[in-house]
Amino acid sequence: MSIFRSYFSKNNTIQKNSFVNTGRNPVMQLFYGTSLQTTAPNGFTRFIFDLDLTPLIENIASGTISTGCTSAMTHTLKMTNTSSFDIDLLNTEASDGSIRATSFDLILFRIPKTSGSTGNSQTWDEGVGYDYVDTPALDSWGFNKAFSTRPSNWYQTTTITNWSYPGIYSNNNTSSGNTGLNYSALTIVDTQHFEFGNEDINFDMTHEINSIITGSTTGSTGWGIAYVPQIENITGLTVTYSVGFFTRHTQTFYQPFLQTTA
């Protein structure tokens, strides 16, 4: 048996109805409930990322991963939860005042082309932002500016291009025509339930990655992680619920990766 790791080439957390960019933050925070710097009555975030699959494909072609693309080869996305180290963190407040989320489902979806399964691929940039909130006082002391609205964000993929639908897709299936995409048309790669909210991400990407290796799937520009629409659309909450996972900028051995086992 051989095990191979593929790492992220870029990642970002986009926030509902906001131009903020947090692409260089070491933690991605998925939240829902009362809005954090977004438009009422509810707010939420979605995480997007891409994988550098070139080394994996080259190792398969060279025979280093000898089984090639067979049913025996599996691919699992692994991300470490920032609350997985201390059970005392359950049901407590995070540093921003949000409550650690429990009992929820996350989806892993493929970033769609401009009209769903057709059209042009949506290429996007990671961005240079860090914080959700601008803090000019820190800038005046000579610290690196942590707040940025440079793309990507909820609306933009790059400086001169936008998502075909703000936030990538509509979670209430209200998009029409070829300019947007509904949740019902997304390619859902996997879904994971979190009972306590301190579990690590373990998404099964076996079929998705194998289809890229064989050429069955082309033009992929990455994937996203989000709460299921039923959670994103909850209104009337008076608190914010959140869960955090380490991103590629963690600078620790908790860096996220795709694990290939053959």
PLM feature segments, named:
Residues 1-262:
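Secreted, disulfide-rich extracellular signaling modules
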